[in-house]
């Protein structure tokens, strides 16, 4: 295996383990991974306690797990679409240059 491949593998391992080591044992109790929606809502209520939202969601997921599932599904669909267009453009480029 070439030296640059070994460096790349070590880089991936370090980038994977660094967040796990930095935040081990810390979680939502200390405010990590809290989410932007909750923080924004708290800040709005702090600035203007009489604020009333313009609208309410027509459906809220019954649990956090389903909310996470829908978020992951949305990310997967987006990745598939982006991957399709990268592959399509690569094939078009290869066909043009043959």
From Swiss-Prot:
Protein's cellular compartments: Cell membrane
Annotated GO biological process: cobalamin biosynthetic process
Pfam families registered for this protein in UniProt: CbiN (PF02553)
Transmembrane segment boundaries: 6-26, 68-88
Presence of the UniProt keyword Ion transport in the record: yes
Highest taxon above the source species: Archaea
Matches recorded under NCBIfam families: cbiN (TIGR01165), PRK02898.1 (NF002780)
Pathway in which the depicted protein is active: Cofactor biosynthesis; adenosylcobalamin biosynthesis
Similarity remark: Belongs to the CbiN family.
Functional summary from the UniProt entry: Part of the energy-coupling factor (ECF) transporter complex CbiMNOQ involved in cobalt import.
GO molecular function: cobalt ion transmembrane transporter activity
A cellular-component GO term for this protein: plasma membrane
Species annotation: Methanococcus maripaludis (strain DSM 14266 / JCM 13030 / NBRC 101832 / S2 / LL)
InterPro entries xref list: CbiN
Keywords of this entry: Cell membrane, Cobalamin biosynthesis, Cobalt, Cobalt transport, Ion transport, Membrane, Transmembrane, Transmembrane helix, Transport
UniProt name for this protein: Cobalt transport protein CbiN
Membrane topology: Multi-pass membrane protein
């Amino acid at each position: 295996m070439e030296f640059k491949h070994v460096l790349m593998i070590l880089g991936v391992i370090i980038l994977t383990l660094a967040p796990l080591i930095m935040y081990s044992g810390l979680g939502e109790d200390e405010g990590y991974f809290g989410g932007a929606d909750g923080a924004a809502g708290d800040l709005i209520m702090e600035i203007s306690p009489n604020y009333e939202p313009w609208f309410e969601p027509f459906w809220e997921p019954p649990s956090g797990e389903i909310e996470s599932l829908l978020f992951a599904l949305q990310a997967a669909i987006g990745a598939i679409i982006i991957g399709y267009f990268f592959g399509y453009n690569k094939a078009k480029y290869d066909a043009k240059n043959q």
